[in-house]
């Protein structure tokens, strides 16, 4: 390849597609959108270091920008564009609206495929088994509830056979009862792939076949991370062949942290050891005790016995830790700086050889089942081997997860990369947990060093005007090209940031809750529509309970129904001229699209600082302080600024929107960091009362 991949031909293709799209939409060029297209094209056209970060304010048109820049270039050099989102809502918008619009109006020819995990698809084999064996009593291999879903499962089969349903969870219209879906889906260990009798009709493989040769694949962060964790190229194309676009990229570090966390419950594991012996023993009996299975199940039983003794000792060692109560049902102990005491690390080390042998034994058992499915084992009833792939595969997955946790704790005092480690305890069990506090090193290893190119974008990537926190958490070098593009909206003319006179300190739960309760009736009477955001369920419940009954009964409170149902009811009320007020916590502070009259007022009850007793946040702060840094100003305040911008972003979604954001936390005025938080917001018109 030449030094500069961004040839005049590719530039002309990008510019031509943009002009064609603007003309077809009767749009005028947006400066911010053009700037975003240029930045992405320049980065992806470089000979190396093809990663950039673009913060694009609401109204920029970022989806069109990154598609118009990436697709023509990827097409020319034979790469696949992977558009990854954090939410289903944006994923559906990209697939159903944005990409079809570009195909139709920009003159670009490209194919699109939607990628979802195997667990989102119905498994015909499991569905058929449930219907076939629903009247039988002896089905130990199925892990389902006692509830009879046979009528529902028959309807699923009918619709799939008729072509009125594609076998995908999100396209099933009616709500599914709890437990119904898990009975008819599987994972990669429970799937016999092309050896399955239903392979040609399989919903998952039909969808996966559509990925082959697709120019653009739309996925989500969880699926991309799962693919990368498997080495890349397992579900999606290999990273070296992909240009990734992470939309809603501010979620990427947290998603990575969650994906690569590990945990194990002590009593649950002891019970699981018994389950291993039950499953393998029953399978061995089912196939008339062939010698190879008898040997494996006997060896595995020996390992579970020895491991059970170690886990019992581990339970005793953990029980003497100085736990602190977190709520009425749970206690927690966090290891300072993630250092595991030698006595506990030694027990985990002692368990490693046996756990490795257990993993190997279950894996070999699973391999023999696969051989039987392929017709390579002369067992009695070998035709039933496929039925056992899922339960044995689930044992295999849990064994590997437990091994990873033990390895983490065994190395807890000597690892290169820092982890938060803590113990949860309730009256039933003790849980060991570990989570990376530097997810960036994982992303660097599995993504940044391997991918052909990548664009990270969102409306909220800077904190207090700097990309430093995002780059640090994501594992990107400080010199990564990073651009912030302002929203085209005229905020001073259309939006007000209001801080009323407040008496209470938000850190005084009772006093602040009482004052919020007194202020809300008047605040909510000012507009027909409002979104009220709390930082904790505890305060939300306390305030809603204390509000006047006539007001409280009309609120649409998160948790009283599904998110979709609440929003639908909210829209119905506004459409019919009624008042409607949504009330929720952090998950309502982003991802809600309530344009126009659907949201004229956002009330933020408290500054969105992280929960002070979260073990991961505590560990991050502890490490920062150990390095001589100020954790509050370097971590807590920037993170709160980012969340505050996201919450305020619920107000203005389109250029004709207007309204008010009200902040019921006087610290934004009285504390030293308050001015920095205000300056990080869009340029609202400020209405700040004198604060006591």
Name what the model sees in each region.
Residues 535-559:
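Conserved helicase motor "Helicase C" RecA-like lobe of SF1/SF2 P-loop NTPases
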Residues 46-68:
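Walker A/P-loop
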Residues 2-19, 23, 28, 58, ...:
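A substrate-engagement module of RecA-like helicase motors
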Residues 41-43, 63-77, 97-101:
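Walker A/P-loop NTP-binding motif
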Residues 182-217, 226-235, 365-503, 510-512, ...:
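A contiguous, basic/glycine-rich beta-loop/short-helix subdomain that forms a polymer-engagement track
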Residues 72, 89-92, 97-100, 188-189, ...:
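Signature of the SF2 helicase/ATPase Hel1-core->accessory helical subdomain module
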Residues 445, 500-535:
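Conserved interdomain hinge at the start of the Helicase C-terminal
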